[in-house]
Amino acid sequence: MAVPVAFFAVFFAYPVVAIVGRGLKADGVWQSGRIGEVLSRPDILGVLGFTTWQALASTALTLLIALPGAYVFARFDFPGKQLLRAVVTVPFVLPTVVVGTAFLALLGRGGFLDELAGVRLDTTVWAILLAHVFFNYAVVVRTVGGLWSQLDPRQEEAARVLGAGRFAAWRRVTLPALAPAVAAAALMVFLFTFTSFGVVQILGGPAYSTLEVEIYRQTAQLLDLPTAAVLTMVQFAAVGAVLAVHAWTVRRREAALKLVDPAQTARRPRGAGQRALLGGVLLTVLVLILLPLGVLVERSLDVPGGHGFDYYRALRSADASGGTFLVAPLEAIWNSLQYALVATVIALVVGGLAAAALTRRAGRLVRGFDALLMLPLGVSAVTVGFGFLITLDKPPLDLRTTWILVPLAQALVGVPFVVRTMLPVLRAVDGRLREAATVLGASPLRAWREVDLPLVRRALLVAAGFAFAVSLGEFGATVFIARPDNPTLPVAVARLLGRSGELNYGQAMALSTILMLVCAASLLLLERIRPDRSGEF
């Protein structure tokens, strides 16, 4: 437990507290009055209101669209089901910058819909909501569908035999069993959309600003640290509350249900109604998920005079006008891969130790630490990144000019995925096997190597894959700490989109396509090696 606690204390809590302190202290004295001053400003109230409203709207829309998909994946067996499950999960591991870029290519000026029907939705709230549904569709499908597939359908059939109608049986038997999973999925979707940054920044334009975008604007553009500090505290409180409720729903789901093998519940769709439902879900996946990704690829190949790889070839040289890149954009790929590999190793060590500690200990303190491990997914990455710059600049942690700063920030986001993936698998390992190895003379290290490691190896690979994918796409903190001569892929895409010109736009599409393909390949590989009990993600 000591290593994970120290890691989070130094590289998460310390930078965040330092930023808040820098903003709310004057001459060493806390200025609590600044909180009321900031929260009473009409512009800040507008940001808070829009952040909450769009998160609630995104959550409701995601549930409405994704719950039929959860049922189809849980109860139907059809050709290509595993591949389709991997496809719908791809958006979840995509960087938000790529998601924003894909929807910009679909809905923006000169985009697919603009050319097809003269319709533009960029800089509208609909673009933000649709992108959020695209991003979080898999959260509902996997969380709710994963539980739904393990519910014994004979219980609902028994209710119908006793006289209940189809809907009444579902409402009285299945819905109460699913409610904790639906609540957990809704809370996670709310968390991800409440803290949305890249999607809103790219698609929302100046008219729309969430808390995360406003923290970035107040910090990086206006240098108004008091306002940024107050907004960080508000976001921290909201995220903490959401995670506390989420932890309660997960415990309730684990404790209250008797589950069966998913292979026993999936059947071929029968009748016109079930086939229509399957067709509707397939159409939703095609339009909502595959179309934006396909348009992104097409726009990366759409060069003057036809289609070709001109934008990809242009990535090999630095910007001739000077100002966007000090190096060729293509080098961002190599930088990102290096950073992500180091971040993955860090996340595996810290997250693996944390999961092992949580498995072998119990109590309210341990449950609290489990919830704290999820905070980096919700607390402002912008705050963490800026906090790195102002705290890790003195011995013995003078890291501001070193390359390790980026992997450390990325690992913070990877650790929760490692913990959530490893924890159920480690809890399923029979401790008596380890005890027997110890009795036979094996040291604790050898017992772990000979007993635990073979049982959790596949889950460890899945955790590594998730950590690699999310590290590769981390943007909020990296945009602050990545050096101009060592940009990552998401930072390079954002810089290109920030400049006018057909070449810059095309290069942004090309880089986004490369990043999408790397993340998709990682996800498809994970689906092939994924064990049945490899966690919530």
Model regions and ranges:
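Transmembrane alpha-helices
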Residues: 2-7, 60, 90, 94, ...
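Interhelical loop and adjacent transmembrane-helix boundary motif
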Residues: 32, 37-43, 194-240, 270-274, ...
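N-terminal signal-anchor/first transmembrane alpha helix
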Residues: 1-18, 82-88, 236, 240-244, ...
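Loop-to-helix entry region at the N-terminal start of transmembrane alpha-helices
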Residues: 1-5, 15, 42-54, 112-139, ...
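Membrane-interfacial helix termini and adjacent extracytoplasmic/periplasmic loops
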Residues: 32-37, 45, 80-81, 100-133, ...
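C-terminal transmembrane helix and the adjacent membrane-cytosol boundary/short C-terminal tail
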Residues: 80-81, 145-172, 199, 229-269, ...
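Transmembrane-helix boundary motif in ABC transporter permease subunits
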Residues: 34, 56-88, 101, 155, ...
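Phosphate-binding active sites in nucleotide-utilizing proteins
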Residues: 280-360, 365-372
